Amino acid sequence: MDKSLIELSEKFRAGQVNRREFIQRVVILAGGAAAAVPLLNQLGFDSTLIREANALGSNIETMDVEFPSGGDLIPAYLAKPLGPGPFRTMIVIHEIFGLSNFIKDVARLLARNNYLALAPCFSEGNCTGGLPDGKHAQWMLDTLQTGVARVPDDEQDKLRDAYAFLSKREDVDTDHIGSVGFCWGGARSFTFATLNPNLWAAVVFYGSTPPLDDLNNINSPVLALYGGLDNASPTSITGRAAETAREMRDRSPKPFEWEVYNQAVHGFFRAGTPPDDHVADTRPALIAKDLMFDFLDRYYDRG
């Protein structure tokens, strides 16, 4: 193996080279992403780095960014196709586990399909995808008991600020900024549709419903995807799916599309455990992925 690659890996492990620079330099030294992957394996790096190297060979770029919110800077992971754009854009909202490698993989999936994707870290102090710190335990308990997600005001503001940050970027198609979220983030994606009349589309993976009185504020089409093997109690996420569909029909002028995958558990779009969590390739996940892109394409065509 080239001595320069070994020296570079030692500098990365010592913190002298950041993650993005390390991956880019390995790809360059190896002569491309395809050649870099086995070298990273030989150097003993985990599959997360290997996926990021593969992403560099998929005509996309990734970067860490920040945007202001409430006097703080919110860290975020951004993935986009190569080129100036403007691109259709999605805010990717993480699970309660924070900005995990799974969520970054979702962002790269969107970028490979010609979207710009911004995945903010909305969990204070939990931007690496670890276990939740308990801050949201009461919120989760209340949501599971009632089947209704009441998102705190400060988190609503962070969603608005993420949208405002994207609206100022030249590579963003500002007429087509949507959101997609998973569980904790699914509830926030659904809620954001009630807060932002300019949101293009909202995709909800096994996320709870906002307060029913807020549904008439929705001005974007919503796609909701549920696992049939999720808790099926009347107030659970899946248990409320049919009621949500009825309420959306009666209260919102915009389309609400929903699917329940009978053999899918809660969290079916994610595979693996941290730090090796990633987008699943199971049948329900693949079908849901295709349905999501079909949904976004249809409502993009309709303007």
Feature roles, as predicted:
Residues 10, 19-46:
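N-terminal export signals
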Residues 50-83:
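N-terminal cap/lid segment of alpha/beta-hydrolase-fold proteins
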Residues 160-219:
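Primarily recognizes the serine-hydrolase "nucleophile elbow" in alpha/beta-hydrolase
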Residues 224-226:
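Short beta-strand/loop motif that positions the catalytic acidic residue
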Residues 252-303:
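C-terminal catalytic histidine-bearing segment of alpha/beta-hydrolase fold enzymes
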